[in-house]
């Protein structure tokens, strides 16, 4: 069964939305890595709990800065592990993924996001600007000739 997935790659948190179930994941955008070999020790909430409590060879990374990917390899690992955790990939059906992006990202950053989503198992990847997705999410008709204001405060 193919599922439609929405992902908000936030600097602080990652949210994953399924069309039929709503928000199914809301965890910190963090990855704990063993710097000696590059192994992922923990992601999300488990990585957050490790902040300031790890030996020097284990560091907690923030792979997203200002809403965009700062470290593509770590972001790919983060997305891949969350997809495995949620069991949203299968050999036979790859999900369509809509990813919210800031309005001011560059084409290089867009390509990095698409690359990360494809590597974690996405079939068709769509990027939409966060304000547009927020407006649709609260039920605004974005195609009507009536003006609306969407304010994103974090």
Regions from the PLM with identified roles:
Residues 1-153:
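Nucleotide/phosphate-binding catalytic cleft detector across ATP-hydrolyzing
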């Amino acid at each position: 069964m193919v599922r439609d997935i929405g992902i908000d790659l936030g600097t602080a948190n990652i949210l994953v939305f399924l069309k039929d179930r709503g928000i199914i994941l809301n965890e910190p955008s963090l990855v704990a890595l063993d710097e000696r070999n590059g192994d992922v020790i923990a992601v999300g909430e488990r990585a957050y709990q490790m902040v300031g409590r790890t030996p020097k060879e284990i560091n907690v990374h923030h792979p997203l800065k200002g809403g965009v990917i700062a470290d593509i390899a770590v972001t790919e690992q983060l997305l891949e592990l969350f997809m495995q955790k949620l069991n949203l990939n299968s050999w036979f059906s790859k999900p369509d993924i809509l990813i919210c992006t800031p309005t001011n990202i560059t084409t290089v950053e867009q390509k990095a996001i698409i690359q990360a989503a494809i590597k974690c198992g996405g079939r068709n990847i769509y990027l939409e600007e966060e304000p547009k997705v927020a407006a649709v999410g609260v039920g605004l008709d974005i195609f009507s000739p009536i003006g609306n204001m969407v304010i994103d405060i974090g």
